[in-house]
């Protein structure tokens, strides 16, 4: 049993792909009696989200430098030094037993500050291709963890999967209900929606509905509701379509769906595996190092997903893939089972166990 009173500083921010896996680990350790504190930046999503889960958060002043202008790049070294000193002050005051970095701007300075203070540093990389921060920090980290095989080529890393919510793991273990006559398509393009899905789905559904009964739950993103609703109506498809700017209850959405049309973010791929759902993946084409394509290959190679590059995606290709799945419900069920077969269901516990072990040694 983990001794109570241990302290962990969690560094994760910027996107849900970093923050939500970190929250899963933080909640697990807090339930074991650990004191959790967060390090992030004040202008990103962690500033709003982390306090809602009851964790204290400290901020440092740091921004990314990839792709920025010359003046900003020249000033970057001085800002990095300042942010390391800010992180060092947080560490000196909190005195963590271990520091966990899970991506985002704050992880870089925080990771360096942890090692300067002689505190064990655990890194977790969610994507199949490591981000710049984790790539650099991996050289000095005490332990490197990753979600997918062959993520790191220059350091030894342990594959542990991506921590996800226990509710989704439990959902995947439940028996699948008998399929309805209508194919139920969940469309998720992230919190901002995906323009390509918003543009293509109304017409694709119109084509599909000529041969097959279909219902759609479509997350369109902020400020896109009216336009997408009008597009479905224009194609005569507003009756079987549920349109939302944002889906708050993804557990309910996954439970409802037969197939998911989505991007291939690391957390999305891990959730699809955990809940055992087949998918049509369209990787975000501007993702750094095209990491979403590599993420999606995990499900594609398992026979659990189709991957359609956005550059070649059109209405007919999308409608064709949906028709293929609608026509063969047995294969659809097999794809869902293959997704579940590649899921790593104890990722949260594995990440926590590494932190616990290092804290006890220290």
From Swiss-Prot:
Broad EC category: transferase
Main location: membrane
Membrane topology annotation: Peripheral membrane protein
Entry superkingdom: Bacteria
Stretches of the chain forming a coiled coil according to its record: none
Pathway: Cell wall biogenesis; peptidoglycan biosynthesis
Family matches, as InterPro entries: GlcNAc_MurG, Glyco_trans_28_C, GlycoTrans_28_N
Binding-site residues, UDP-N-acetyl-alpha-D-glucosamine: 15-17, 127, 165, 191, 247, 266-271, 292
One of the record's GO cellular component terms: plasma membrane
Cell compartments where the protein resides: Cell inner membrane
Keywords of the record: Cell cycle, Cell division, Cell inner membrane, Cell membrane, Cell shape, Cell wall biogenesis/degradation, Glycosyltransferase, Membrane, Peptidoglycan synthesis, Transferase
Presence of the UniProt keyword Phosphoprotein in the record: no
Reactions performed catalytically: di-trans,octa-cis-undecaprenyl diphospho-N-acetyl-alpha-D-muramoyl-L-alanyl-D-glutamyl-meso-2,6-diaminopimeloyl-D-alanyl-D-alanine + UDP-N-acetyl-alpha-D-glucosamine = di-trans,octa-cis-undecaprenyl diphospho-[N-acetyl-alpha-D-glucosaminyl-(1->4)]-N-acetyl-alpha-D-muramoyl-L-alanyl-D-glutamyl-meso-2,6-diaminopimeloyl-D-alanyl-D-alanine + UDP + H(+)
Keyword NAD (UniProt): no
MF (Gene Ontology): UDP-N-acetyl-D-glucosamine:N-acetylmuramoyl-L-alanyl-D-glutamyl-meso-2,6-diaminopimelyl-D-alanyl-D-alanine-diphosphoundecaprenol 4-beta-N-acetylglucosaminlytransferase activity; undecaprenyldiphospho-muramoylpentapeptide beta-N-acetylglucosaminyltransferase activity
Enzyme Commission numbers on file: 2.4.1.227
Family recorded in the similarity comment: Belongs to the glycosyltransferase 28 family. MurG subfamily.
Task of the protein: Cell wall formation. Catalyzes the transfer of a GlcNAc subunit on undecaprenyl-pyrophosphoryl-MurNAc-pentapeptide (lipid intermediate I) to form undecaprenyl-pyrophosphoryl-MurNAc-(pentapeptide)GlcNAc (lipid intermediate II).
Alphabetized HAMAP family for the sequence: MurG (MF_00033)
Protein's name according to its UniProt entry: UDP-N-acetylglucosamine--N-acetylmuramyl-(pentapeptide) pyrophosphoryl-undecaprenol N-acetylglucosamine transferase
Species annotation: Shewanella baltica (strain OS185)
Gene that this sequence comes from: murG
